[in-house]
């Protein structure tokens, strides 16, 4: 695979989308965005593609809406054959390009690995994933091996003030008002 982008050394990247099939003969690709607003993927630049274990930097030359989706053309990718090599590759960005959030806002990735503890001090486990349900986000918490309630995993709604009492970034801890039996 020819690497037309610029190789980078930093390994911390966030996947924000994926390339689909080629579009046309001039190097365009379909883009599937994982961002809340699909078109927001184009606000983050440059993009990084993992090629042979290394992050390679690409800049978006142009993009447009097409039917119900989006297509993009990367700089230096001018023929269908080059674009075809990118099919199904994930699109990642450097976390530094994300906007700063206020003290009470969080990116999901910040919550992963945090310990979840009840207001009474019971350790429920560690956040391993988040789910988007439409009405509210949900913490997926992997329970401790010694969980007295026999739980392997808990789903805890991320409802601030009702369930989520405090998120302490520094201590990597989330305090919740939650019954360990659930």
From Swiss-Prot:
Molecular function via GO: ribosome binding
Domain observations: The PRC barrel domain binds ribosomal protein uS19.
Domain PRC barrel: 103-182
GO BP, sorted A to Z: ribosomal small subunit biogenesis; rRNA processing
Annotated Gene Ontology cellular component terms: cytoplasm; ribosome
HAMAP family the UniProt entry points to: Ribosome_mat_RimM
Official protein name in the record: Ribosome maturation factor RimM
Top-rank taxon: Bacteria
Keywords, ordered alphabetically: Chaperone, Cytoplasm, Ribosome biogenesis, rRNA processing
SUPFAM superfamilies named among the record's database cross-references: PRC-barrel domain, Translation proteins
Keyword RNA-binding: no
Principal cellular location given in the protein's record: cytoplasm
The protein's assembly and partners: Binds ribosomal protein uS19.
Function as written in the Swiss-Prot or TrEMBL entry: An accessory protein needed during the final step in the assembly of 30S ribosomal subunit, possibly for assembly of the head region. Essential for efficient processing of 16S rRNA. May be needed both before and after RbfA during the maturation of 16S rRNA. It has affinity for free ribosomal 30S subunits but not for 70S ribosomes.
Upper taxonomic lineage: Bacteria, Pseudomonadati, Pseudomonadota, Gammaproteobacteria, Vibrionales
Gene designation: rimM
Family, as annotated: Belongs to the RimM family.
PANTHER family tied to this protein: RIBOSOME MATURATION FACTOR RIMM
Organism: Vibrio parahaemolyticus serotype O3:K6 (strain RIMD 2210633)
């Amino acid at each position: 695979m020819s690497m037309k982008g610029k190789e980078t050394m930093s390994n911390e990247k966030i996947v924000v989308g994926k390339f689909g099939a080629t579009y046309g003969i001039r190097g365009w690709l379909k883009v599937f965005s994982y961002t809340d607003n699909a078109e927001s993927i184009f606000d983050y630049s440059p993009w990084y593609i993992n090629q042979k274990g290394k992050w390679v930097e690409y800049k978006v030359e142009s993009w447009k809406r097409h039917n119900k989706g989006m297509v993009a053309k990367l700089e230096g990718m001018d023929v269908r054959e080059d674009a075809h090599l990118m099919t199904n590759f994930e699109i990642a960005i450097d976390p530094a390009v994300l906007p700063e959030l206020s003290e009470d806002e969080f990116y999901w990735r910040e919550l992963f690995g945090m310990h979840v503890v009840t207001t009474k001090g019971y350790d429920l486990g560690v956040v391993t994933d988040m789910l988007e349900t439409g009405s509210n986000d949900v913490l997926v918490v992997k329970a401790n091996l010694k969980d007295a309630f026999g739980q392997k995993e808990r789903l805890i709604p991320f409802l601030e003030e009702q369930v989520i009492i405090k998120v302490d970034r520094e201590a990597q801890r989330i305090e919740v008002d939650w019954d360990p039996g659930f």
